């Protein structure tokens, strides 16, 4: 499934569904990662060829994460805490932002079967992207409707994600 939405003159939302890993995760994951890798590489190469790479940020997300422990079908089930991949000409790459939790069973953020409680909301990353993209501050509540539920320290500073020079 593919879905494309223009959110503003500077923000485009693009959705593609590649499949699921409830069954046979190890057998399917390498192929799925190769598909994602090839797609991200093709996108980056096209943006560079069009000389727009420095004004583009791509963020790869999921509406849910996967459990770290296998289910009965050698797959992985839905969970909460997950990761994002960001890339673009202005992105400060090669870093992990945030604190990666302990994956061992019984760890503070592991509530069982490898289901991790997130330590950051998606707004903590989307708000600095909106700032970088030049979204007016009056629209922040529309883009990140839960942002007032968190202290300012919850949000990743745009300077941690982007080269702002």
Q: Whereabouts are the PLM-identified features?
A:
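Accessory "access/gating" subregions that flank catalytic or transport cores
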Residues: 1-20
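Feature marks hydrolase-like catalytic cores characterized by long aromatic- and Gly/Pro-rich stretches
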Residues: 17-165
């Amino acid at each position: 499934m593919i879905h494309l939405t223009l959110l503003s003159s500077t923000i485009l939302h693009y959705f593609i569904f590649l499949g699921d890993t409830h069954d046979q995760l190890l057998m399917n994951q390498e192929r799925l990662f190769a598909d994602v890798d090839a797609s991200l590489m093709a996108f980056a190469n096209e943006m560079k060829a069009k000389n727009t790479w420095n004004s583009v940020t791509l963020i790869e997300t999921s509406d849910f994460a996967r459990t770290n422990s296998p289910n009965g079908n050698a797959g992985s089930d839905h969970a909460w805490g997950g990761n994002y991949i960001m890339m673009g000409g202005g992105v400060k790459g090669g870093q992990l932002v945030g604190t990666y939790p302990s994956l061992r069973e019984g760890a503070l953020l592991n509530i069982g079967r490898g289901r991790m409680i997130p330590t950051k909301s998606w707004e903590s990353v989307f708000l600095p992207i909106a700032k970088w993209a030049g979204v007016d501050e009056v629209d922040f509540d529309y883009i990140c409707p839960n942002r007032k539920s968190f202290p300012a320290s919850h949000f990743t500073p745009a300077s941690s994600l982007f080269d702002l020079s």
